[in-house]
Regions:
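Amphipathic alpha-helical coiled-coil segments
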Residues: 19-34, 109, 113-132, 143, ...
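Transmembrane beta-barrel architecture of outer-membrane proteins
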Residues: 71-73, 119, 164, 275-277
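Membrane-embedded beta-strand positions in outer-membrane beta-barrel channels/transporters
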Residues: 7, 75-77, 121, 279-281, ...
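Acidic, low-complexity, intrinsically disordered peripheral segments
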Residues: 52, 379-429
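Small/polar (Gly/Ser/Thr/Ala-rich) solvent-exposed segments
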Residues: 18, 41-68, 79-108, 230, ...
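Periplasmic alpha-helical coiled-coil/stalk elements that build and connect Gram-negative outer-membrane
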Residues: 112-223, 324-327, 331, 372-373, ...
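Regulatory alphaC helix of protein kinase catalytic domains
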Residues: 1-7
Length: 429
């Protein structure tokens, strides 16, 4: 399995991403609801019952003042919005902005899950190397311990040397057990992220060439390209359109109304009535208990809230980028030194073994060299994977991880229109 395949499996199967996709699909339906405001409404109203009427027409009949009849009525009515204070176009724009927000949020979720997949993928590879190092270290201790035990049995070695050798052997075995548990944990995390077991994992190529030359370029890419930031900007647009929607009640509403009706025995008059009408109807609210004004003010505050959320998102993303960049730079400086440490320690062990064959080193000296080599190799492995993962963190912060890994995201991750963030970091003084 390659790293790209692992990320693709995560994107295809992770429930967190599926939840975001369903959120987008729900927003798509809201757009259809909003566009329904452009279409006419057609209603059929019908009724049947008994009606008692006391009216001038019934009183004119003489003998009694009331008329009780079985009545029925039916009306077919069409109403087409002509002007609604720009409510419908602004509501359509608001829901479309929400769709864009959900689409970019899917992208952001996919980027986060991809980075998590990279983390668990590299962790499995690292832990497998750690297990191999611990196993080799244990085998080296067993060889030396066998030699010390043999010398002790022949009366050449001391009991103290044997005890010390046994203690170091126990520690080496314990180190192997610990690394095996760490590997099992890493494999469990891998399955949780990808939904697949980590069988044969290919070592991914280094992404050193994918990282910008300096943090300023990376920061600019974050501001231009990070999907979470674009999602927050789309929420700002949605809040602005919600403010325009809140203005609609301050305008009169005009509708074209077409209706036809058929009635029997209504209003105390026996007989059948057929009517039709065509009219432009105006509805203009003059006072609504100040509720419309309060809704407008609430929408204005929502705009400010969404802008603050967007600006805070940029600060968090910039912080994450800076931390990832610092970790990358630190690991880059440490990796060559850790490699030198491992190389020189390996040479020292070889020299110790040669000196031991000449009688210039003891078996305990060999154990010391084995422990030193194990520590050096563990350190080099740790720093090497830390450097690699920190580079992936930088790429993910820029919103480029999925693209560079050629991962196919769901169709719902595509926004209706491109969104450019207007957030800017405060000046650094």
């Amino acid at each position: 399995m390659t790293l790209s395949e692992a990320i693709q499996s995560t994107v295809d199967n992770h429930p967190e991403l599926h939840a975001s996709v369903n959120d987008r699909l729900s927003a798509d339906e809201d757009v259809k609801v909003a566009k329904g405001g452009y279409l006419p409404t057609v209603d059929l109203i019908a009724g049947y019952g008994r009606e008692q009427t006391d009216s001038p027409s019934t009183r004119a009949l003489g003998n009694h003042n009331k008329e009780t009849l079985n009545y029925s009525d039916a009306e077919l009515r069409l109403r087409q919005m002509l002007f609604d204070g720009f409510n419908t176009p602004n509501e359509v724009a608001r829901t479309q902005a929400t769709v864009n927000s959900r689409a970019y949020y899917i992208q952001g979720t996919a980027e986060s899950l991809a980075l998590r997949t990279v983390e668990v993928y590299l962790e499995v590879l690292k832990r497998r190397e750690m297990v191999a190092l611990a196993r080799n270290n244990l085998q080296a201790h067993e060889r030396v311990n066998d030699q010390i035990k043999l010398r002790s049995e022949r009366g050449v070695g001391s009991t103290a040397d044997l005890d010390q050798s046994e203690a170091r052997l126990a520690l080496a075995a314990n180190n192997l057990y610990t690394e095996e548990v760490n590997l099992a944990d890493a494999e469990a995390n891998f399955f949780s992220s990808t939904g697949r077991l980590p069988d044969e994992l290919e070592q991914p190529a280094s992404v050193k060439g994918e990282v910008p030359e300096n943090i300023e370029l990376a920061r600019q890419t974050v501001m231009d390209n990070n999907p979470y930031l674009k999602s927050a900007q789309a929420d700002v647009y949605a809040a602005e359109k919600q403010y325009e929607v809140a203005k609609a009640p301050f305008y009169p509403r005009f509708d074209l109304e077409l209706a036809t009706s058929a009635d029997d025995n209504v209003q105390g008059d026996e007989g059948h009535y057929n009517t039709w009408r065509a009219a432009v109807v105006m509805n203009y609210n003059l006072f609504n208990g100040m509720r419309d004004k309060a809704r407008l003010q609430a929408a204005a505050h929502s705009i400010n809230q969404s802008m603050d959320i967007r600006n805070n998102a940029l600060r968090v993303l910039n912080e994450n980028l800076a931390l990832a960049w610092n970790a990358m730079e630190n690991a880059r400086m440490q990796t060559p030194k850790a490699r030198d440490y491992a190389d020189y320690t390996a040479r020292s062990r070889e020299a110790y073994q040669q000196q031991f064959s000449l009688g210039q080193r003891t078996l305990l000296d060999l154990l010391d060299s084995e422990n030193e080599l194990f520590t050096a190799n563990r350190r080099y492995t740790e720093v090497r994977y830390t450097e690699e993962f920190s580079m992936y963190r930088v790429i993910s912060a820029m919103g480029e991880l999925l693209r560079k890994q050629n991962v196919v995201v769901p169709a719902e991750a595509v926004a209706l229109t491109e969104v450019k963030s207007e957030a800017r970091l405060p000046e650094m003084r």
